[in-house]
Every structure is written in C-alpha cells, then in structure tokens.
Amino acid sequence: MAAQVTLEDALSNVDLLEELPLPDQQPCIEPPPSSLLYQPNFNTNFEDRNAFVTGIARYIEQATVHSSMNEMLEEGQEYAVMLYTWRSCSRAIPQVKCNEQPNRVEIYEKTVEVLEPEVTKLMNFMYFQRNAIERFCGEVRRLCHAERRKDFVSEAYLITLGKFINMFAVLDELKNMKCSVKNDHSAYKRAAQFLRKMADPQSIQESQNLSMFLANHNKITQSLQQQLEVISGYEELLADIVNLCVDYYENRMYLTPSEKHMLLKVMGFGLYLMDGSVSNIYKLDAKKRINLSKIDKYFKQLQVVPLFGDMQIELARYIKTSAHYEENKSRWTCTSSGSSPQYNICEQMIQIREDHMRFISELARYSNSEVVTGSGRQEAQKTDAEYRKLFDLALQGLQLLSQWSAHVMEVYSWKLVHPTDKYSNKDCPDSAEEYERATRYNYTSEEKFALVEVIAMIKGLQVLMGRMESVFNHAIRHTVYAALQDFSQVTLREPLRQAIKKKKNVIQSVLQAIRKTVCDWETGHEPFNDPALRGEKDPKSGFDIKVPRRAVGPSSTQLYMVRTMLESLIADKSGSKKTLRSSLEGPTILDIEKFHRESFFYTHLINFSETLQQCCDLSQLWFREFFLELTMGRRIQFPIEMSMPWILTDHILETKEASMMEYVLYSLDLYNDSAHYALTRFNKQFLYDEIEAEVNLCFDQFVYKLADQIFAYYKVMAGSLLLDKRLRSECKNQGATIHLPPSNRYETLLKQRHVQLLGRSIDLNRLITQRVSAAMYKSLELAIGRFESEDLTSIVELDGLLEINRMTHKLLSRYLTLDGFDAMFREANHNVSAPYGRITLHVFWELNYDFLPNYCYNGSTNRFVRTVLPFSQEFQRDKQPNAQPQYLHGSKALNLAYSSIYGSYRNFVGPPHFQVICRLLGYQGIAVVMEELLKVVKSLLQGTILQYVKTLMEVMPKICRLPRHEYGSPGILEFFHHQLKDIVEYAELKTVCFQNLREVGNAILFCLLIEQSLSLEEVCDLLHAAPFQNILPRVHVKEGERLDAKMKRLESKYAPLHLVPLIERLGTPQQIAIAREGDLLTKERLCCGLSMFEVILTRIRSFLDDPIWRGPLPSNGVMHVDECVEFHRLWSAMQFVYCIPVGTHEFTVEQCFGDGLHWAGCMIIVLLGQQRRFAVLDFCYHLLKVQKHDGKDEIIKNVPLKKMVERIRKFQILNDEIITILDKYLKSGDGEGTPVEHVRCFQPPIHQSLASS
C-alpha cells in the first residue's frame, strides 16, 4: 500500500507547481538560446585503437600516427589563436625617454616581468613550427620512400596532411600580419639586454633566432619548401593531397564552411609548395597528374576565402607567387580582376529562398508529427525507411545551413578585401577608416537586407532543427547502425564467399577484419553454419540472416577502421603489382564505393548538435583583430557604427522595412555567436568583455530606436483613424493625398518577453513599455504645454491631441501593459493630488487676462470674437514648446491636416469650445473657474464700476421728465441731448467704464453658455445610462392593446442590463453603495432642474448692496418717476450715449464691446428689480415711440434722428431678449402653481390745480 501523504505535504507539493516554467505563446523570432545540455564528444582520437586486435595491423599503426598528428594540429590552432588575438603590450608600457632617466631600471624590470611570459609563448611557437615542419616532412619522406610509393594511403591520412598544409599557411600569414608581436619582442629584448638577463650564449642565440624568425616574412613557408624539396618525389604525394581536395570539393564531400574553405586553401598552398626549383606544376598538369583548369575554375568561382578571423586570403595569390607563374600566366583566369557572381548575394537570394521554402515545408511535416503532436515518442513503431528519411532530412538541413553560412562569410570576406571609396560610394567620406570602408560604406541597402534575410533563415532553421534534435539523433544512430550492419553482415557476405572460394587470402582477411570490427550479431556471435564462410552456395531454402536494429552509432575509431579497410579494397594503389580492386566483381565495387561515400558524413551526423552549431556559426562577422592591427594603436576598438551586427540591426530600424522587422533579433544574435566563440574557441576574456560592452550600448540604442518607432507608428495610426474622412477625400480631389501608415510588424516584437542575449533573458516588452510610457507622458505634457502657450481658442486642438493620444494608448494597450490613460493624463495635468490641474488654471488665466477684456459677444451667432479695439495691454504668453511630429498628431502631413481643421476654430470662442471646456474641466474645474469669475465680477461691481456709477450719478440731471408727444421727435431728441450733455461728453464713459461693464457681461455669458454645454453633456449621459437604469421609452400601442403588458415584456427583455439589482446580487457592499449612488446621481441630476446660473445671479445680487444702485426712498412712497436717482435712469443715459450713431471712421459700441456690455447693464437692472421701470421710463424708448408716431428725420446737434432711432430699435429688441432670459432663470426657483400677484392700494392721484386747494 502506498505511504500516506499528509495534508501539509500535499499542499506544499501543490505550491511547488507554481515554480514550473510554463511555455508561453511568444512568437519565435530569435535563435535558440545556448544549450545547457552537454554536447557529448564521442571522438576518442584513436585512444581505443589497440582494442581492435582483429583489424589490419597496418591501419592500427596508421591510427597511432593520426592521433599524434591531430594533437599537433590542435596545438597549431592554439598558436593561431595566440597570434590572432595578440594585442600590443609594449604600447601600454611607459617608455624610457633617455639614459639619464632615474626610474629607467624600474621601468625595464617591469617590462621584463610583464613581457617574459609572452615572449616564452613566442619562443615555444618558434620551436613548435620547427617540430611541425620536421614532423610533416618526416611523414612525407616516409610515404615517398621508393618501397612505399606503390602502397595505398588512406583518404583520412591524406586529409590530415592537408590540414597540416592549411595550418602552415594560416600560421605564416598570422605571423606576417602581427607587427605588435615583433614590437613586443623588441621591447623585451631591449629591457633584457639592459638588465643583462640573457648572459649565456645559447639564450642570446635563441633570442636572435626568434628575432629573425619574427622579422622574416613567409619564414614558415620558406622552411617548409626548403625541407620538402630535398625529398625525392614529394610532389607526387602533394599531388595526391591536392587531387583528393579537388575530388572532395567537386563532390561536396564537406559539411561545415571551415572544411569547404580548408579544401580550397590546401589546393592553393599545395600548388605553391609543388611549384618550386625541383618540380613544376605545369609539367604535372601536362602528365595529367593534376588538373589545373579545374582548380582555376574553382578559384575563379570563389576568389576570396576566410583565412582566420577577419583575415582573408585571395586564392589567386598562391598561384601568382609560385615559381613558374610568369611564363604560364595566360593559362589562369582566376588571377584576372573582376568580381565573381558568387559575391552578388542579391542575385543568389531567389535560389536561397526557394531552397529554404522547399526544405522548411518538408521539415514542418515531420516537425508537426514529431514535436507538436508528440507521436515522436513511439520510436519503436517507425520503419527503417522512415528513419532513413529523417536521416536524409538532417543531412540535407545541415548542408543547406552550411551552404548559406559559407555564403554569408564569403560575401563578407570579399567585402573586407575590396573596401569601397568615395568614387564607388558617394556617402563614403574622404576621412573614412579602412575598416569603415570595408563594412559601414561597403554594402548597398539591398545587400544589407539580403544578408539579414539569409542570417534569419540560418538562425530560424537552426531553431527548428534544434527542436527536433532528439528525433534526429535517434534516427541518425538507428540508420547508421542499420546501414553498417546490413552492409557488413549481408552485403559483404557474397564477396567473402567468392574470396574464400577463389582462395584470395588478402581480400578474405580484409573482409573478415571488417566484419569482426563492426558486426553486431543477433546471437552474439557469427553463425557457424553460414555456407558463405566455407565458400559454398546457400541452400535452396535460403540462409536467413537476421540483422538486429538498435539506435547505436559506431565509435570514431571503428568507423575509421572500416572505411580505411574498405578503401584499401577499392584503391588504385596497393602494395603488390596487382591491386585488390581488380580481384573484386563490378557490383561489389559499386556497393563498397556507395557505402564509402555515404559513410563520409556519419561522423558529422553522429555529433549532430555540435555540427549544427558549426554550420550556423557566424561569429567571425564581429572579430576585427586584423583591422585593429592596421590602425597601429590609433584605435583600441572600433565604434558600433562600423560593427557588422549593429550595421544590419540599425539598417532595419532606420529603413522601417516591414518585411524585415521580425528579423531584427537575428542580426543581434551575431553577438551571441561571437561571445560564445571568444570564450570557447579563443578562450579570451578581454574579447568577451569588448563584445559585452558593445552589446550593452547597442541594445540600449536598439530599445531606444524601436520604442520611438513603435510609438510614432501607433500615433500616426491613431491620427489617421481619427482624421475626418471628408477632409481626406477633399484633399485627394485637390491632388494632395494624406497616406495611411503602411502596415508594420511590431506586434511580434512587442510579444517578446524573454529575448536571449549573452546569456541574459531580457523582457523586451517591459523595456519598450517603459519608453512608450515616457513618450506617452511627454505627448500629453506637450499637448497641455502647447495649450498653455496659446489663447482659449486652442482648447479644441488640445482636445483633439488628447483624443489622438487616447486612441494611441488604446492601440498600444493591446500589446503593452501601460498605466491607465486617465492616470497618465492626470499626472501630466498635475492633477493627481491638486484639486485642479494645469488646464483649469490656464482656462481661468485666459478668461481673466484675455477673454473677459478682449472678446465681444454676438448673440446672433452665439460666439465671442476678438475686439477690433483692445483696451487692455497685450497678454504675454510662454513660448510654444518645440516638438517632433510623433509627439503631436503623428506625422508632418497629419500635423498640417489637423492644423487646417483647428484653424477654423481659431478666430472665435463658441459652443465647440464650451463643450470641450466642460469635458476637460469637469464639475470640479468648472466650479473653481466660476468661483474665481464671481470674485472678478465682485471686484469690478464693488470697485471701478461702483466709482463710475457714483461719479456719473452726480453729473446726471436731478430730474428729467419724459417730454410730451406734442414736442415731436426732433424736439425730444434735442431735449434729451441737452439734459444728458455731461454724460454724453464724459470722456471715460466709452472707454474704461464700458470696458469694465463688458468684462462683467462676458463673465455672465461665459457662465450661462458653460451651463448650456454642461446640460447637453448631462442629457447625453442620461440617454447612455438609460438602458442600464431600467428607463425605457414608451412603446407604440395599437387599439385594443394594453400598455402595461407591453412594457412588462420590454422590462423583462432588458432586465439583464439593469445594473443596480445585478450588483446587489453579485457585488460587495462597497460596490453596491457605489452603484446606488451613481444611479441616484444620474437620475436626479437633470430631473430636479438644478440651475447653476440662477445661483450665480443670486450671488451677484448680493454684491449690489451699495445704496447708490437703488437710490433713496421715493418721496411719494411708491416709486421715483422723474428723479434720476436709480441705476436704470443712469443706464438709460448710457444707452442714449451708445445709440448716438458714430462717424464713418469710428467704431460702434457693438464692434468695441459686443453684447457683453448690454448683458451687464440689463443684469444689474433685473437684479435690482428695475426692469419694468426701465422699459417704461427709458429716454431712448420714449424717443422711439414718438418718432414711430411722427416719422420725422432731422439732424439735431450732428445726430441723424432716423439712424439713431434705428439703433434704439435694435437695442430694445436685444434688451428685451436679455431681460426675458434673466427673468426666466431668476423665476425658475419660484414656487410652482399659479403666481401670486402682490397688490398694494394707493390713493388716487390728484391734479396739481386741485392739490393746492
């Protein structure tokens, strides 16, 4: 029975589940991260050779030689790395200026201390190349011995010798290139001689030898050639090596790019070594020993190959520098100048895309069944053919990857050898450095895109193949095992039978050695009763051999032994006069050749993950030690603008090419390759540190540019979506097209949550979110800043900018976790903790300093326009902040379009502006502004206006009766003109006094119009909220139908939308309270008919507390009739003044002050309750009545009567309208029902003649 698990343990186990990483749905647009799994290395370097006692002894001995040569090659690689990554130490050490310098001993001691370990390495390098040359020449001498010349030499052996030739070529070029090595040695030698470090003659001699070795160019090549030329027949062996390389290259018997380039270098350097004083390659060609025309063709196709790091070699150089080139110059085409089509990557792209598409489609079929559906777990159910298909697929994939990687490196190599100049590229400045001309200015836009695309294909396919690694590994081991066992147990059975039968002992021993080396018998041993072993035929019933199936590959030694022994059977050379090949039958030879060719790739495929990585390695695109050496210490490192990974990344960002945007992370991955290579192959921490420093800088730049682009893209998108469609079509008709932004693929990049770079996992989404949030905030800041630097009319543009930002926020929020737009807006508006924000403050500021004193209201258009004659000083505003288009409407074209739209709102303040003010200020902001406006009105009414009223009351006539009709209108006009002479001639009346009244009137009108706009907003709210509050419209009822039944049906239909019961059922107490309050507020806001304007008028009435407004109590106890002591008589006098028509070049009171002046006067009259007296006793109205009756027109004291009466008529209509509106608002609060008339009884009036009696 299972052990009991306690509840506590069970809960802790469940908690642990949270720590399990769950794969997210992030789109894969980056290469695979560095594997944390081990890459097993099954290459034993023939350490297990002695175990194969059944093998042919000679090949076991050869394996021993191979083993030591491989070790030497590894050591050579280490010296190549040492030379390539050598940075000058002597430049960093302070130099001794003169012999009298006091601290020179100390400097020399430090120099020796620092440089001694480095010079020791150089000394070891000199010894190594001596030993290597001796070893190589020893092998050549052994193989060229007269007795051994007919012997068979295996391909593996020849290729190893070829690798030696390649090593010598690389080491010599590196030694030639590195001046810093010689300089460091010289500095050390100087210091050591001064300190007498090298006393014994031997060390002096060795030091001298090292100096000569380092100073002499091509020293290694010369030594090698000298020692080879004394060996008789050395050119025959070299010809074999070169021919093998030609054969391998022709039949594509290579897998990694480095193997391909090595074959070419061995051909070139091999020919150079063969063409000397002893031998002549052209004679060998004539004897058909080598094929120079074929080599020439390959060298023409691929003129430049990578040598080491960023060092390249032109293959034709080996030919040009050979001994007999001059007299045979005409035979070579590769030495002529001119580019090979191989380097035109743009033309190659069609083929590469086709290959990529074809292979990806094929791979996807297997990938979907193996990885996605998980059927790959049932390994045992697959047939040999299915495994073979997977095996072929793996090989084909590796070959494609290798081909593309080689292609990229070859184009890069060609460009490094052929830098551009100002004639080839007009963008290239004269002052450009060598490396800059080779990288930054050396690629066209198309070439950069082609490189990016190929790199993306390489890295993308690497991901897909990496995912199937386990599937491929199993299939490869299974297929290799099956092929090896079928071949050894079944295919070789017939030739073995023939050899035994015909007593061909050598072939028999080789075949049996092969079978003993690799056969894995079903029963554990070779069947004893096999007729073939006796040279007999199989029985008629057949002899069944069951070959087992396992997923186990052969060891590296096993594979080498089998291939070498098979090769010996079909080789053209063998120790005796007659070759073994001639003793074999035709089909057998074909079988052996086929297996030998196929098994060439087994070693690579068995080490699948390592080979995959080598085929995709583009690390050399970053290394630049050769070009740094050329700067002679002027440069410690090159800037990122010259670095290939950044050049490609930046090109995508700068061009904003949509089809390339998803590839941007692949070009950044080149840094991963280089860093991995610096640590694992070069073993140099300082190179890794330099790569890391560049990555830090580049990634910052990348995020900065990408975030800016993304923000700008979505801002343009928002601006385009919100742009008036009619304007767009109108512009199109006029021939100016406002383009919609082309679609781009930022979504995939925005979904990247864990980008792998130098072993770090980076949340790209979060980094972009931070930058976009900052840009969003800056946009809002800028919109408000622009508003603060302009007048009140620009509030419509502010609203438009905020809407575009809101839309941008909405579009971006699909992919980024941004703060809420309202929270961002409040922060930009400085309205988080403060009760009112920047917009509210600026609205009031503008109202106070510009709107009230400088705008004229026109009741007909319901708009304010700027006055023609300003009375206040011009208002100074802040300078408008500068801004890039993406922080405004998105682009220059959109900025122009929107500017033209908002331009039509610039010359007035009207309903559109008030609606925006209501939306942006909200209840709180409006309350603040109105409170402040009331303070302004109070200060005016109790300040300057009161002073003018007092002053003007003093110059008013004490009594001014309304003359009788008999006097006629001209007489009455003359009478009033005379009576009001002091008022008419009062200088400040038409300026300061009217200006102050206009300010009060504008303030009143602002409050009224704001309330009207607010009502519209509230009605809109109410209608939007109605379906959620169970407020349903009455339905149409036909005759005979009942209304309540229909309404019930409607209510039940909309019940799920009714919010309050829903929240009462499902919500928390806090949510229920909020829902109820919201419901109540929405319902009651308009229903109870609250009026803000009435409250404002009531407040203003309280400001009119001075007795001068109402005058003393009437002597008759009822009202003043003829006395001029109440405000309405003063206003009548003012009205008389502004009704007088003006001259031709003068401004009317309407132009200067607008309707605000009349609103102020009428409001004061209404608030004082004098409106009816004003209507009855006004001077102008009296004149209008009389003139209407008699219809006269005269010019009295320069005043045309008819024109004046015309003006009076207009103002009477305006006054009546204003007074009616004010009356309506003031009476809105009176009790409902019939109005109560207040009646007072007075004594009937007595005529004056009777009164005295």
UniProtKB/Swiss-Prot annotation:
Pfam family membership, one: CYRIA-B_Rac1-bd
Report keywords, A-Z.
Actin-binding, Cell projection, Cell shape, Cytoplasm, Developmental protein, Differentiation, Neurogenesis, Phosphoprotein, Synapse, Synaptosome
Record InterPro entries? CYRIA/CYRIB_Rac1-bd (IPR009828), Cytoplasmic_FMR1-int (IPR008081)
**What subcellular compartments does it reside in?**
Cytoplasm; Cytoplasm, Perinuclear region; Cell projection, Lamellipodium; Cell projection, Ruffle
Question: Where does it primarily localize?
Answer: cytoplasm
Q: Where Phosphoserine occurs, residue numbers?
A: S583
Positions of modified residues (Phosphothreonine): T1234
Instruction: Cite the GO molecular-function annotations of the record.
Output: actin filament binding; RNA 7-methylguanosine cap binding; small GTPase binding; translation repressor activity
Q: Name one GO biological process term.
A: lamellipodium assembly
Lineage top rank: taxon: Eukaryota
One GO cellular component this record assigns the protein to is: extracellular exosome
Stated role: Component of the CYFIP1-EIF4E-FMR1 complex which binds to the mRNA cap and mediates translational repression. In the CYFIP1-EIF4E-FMR1 complex this subunit is an adapter between EIF4E and FMR1. Promotes the translation repression activity of FMR1 in brain probably by mediating its association with EIF4E and mRNA. Regulates formation of membrane ruffles and lamellipodia. Plays a role in axon outgrowth. Binds to F-actin but not to RNA. Part of the WAVE complex that regulates actin filament reorganization via its interaction with the Arp2/3 complex.
Q: Which family does it belong to?
A: Belongs to the CYFIP family.
* Subunit organization: Component of the WAVE1 complex composed of ABI2, CYFIP1 or CYFIP2, BRK1, NCKAP1 and WASF1/WAVE1. Within the complex, a heterodimer containing NCKAP1 and CYFIP1 interacts with a heterotrimer formed by WAVE1, ABI2 and BRK1. Component of the CYFIP1-EIF4E-FMR1 complex which is composed of CYFIP, EIF4E and FMR1. Interacts with FMR1 but does not bind to related proteins FXR1 or FXR2. Interaction with EIF4E stimulates FMR1 binding. Component of the WAVE2 complex composed of ABI1, CYFIP1/SRA1, NCKAP1/NAP1 (NCKAP1l/HEM1 in hematopoietic cells) and WASF2/WAVE2.
Further comment found in the protein's record: Breakpoint hotspot for the Prader-Willi/Angelman syndromes and may be implicated in autism. Commonly altered in tumors.
This protein is called Cytoplasmic FMR1-interacting protein 1
Natural source organism: Homo sapiens (Human)
Record lineage? Eukaryota, Metazoa, Chordata, Craniata, Vertebrata
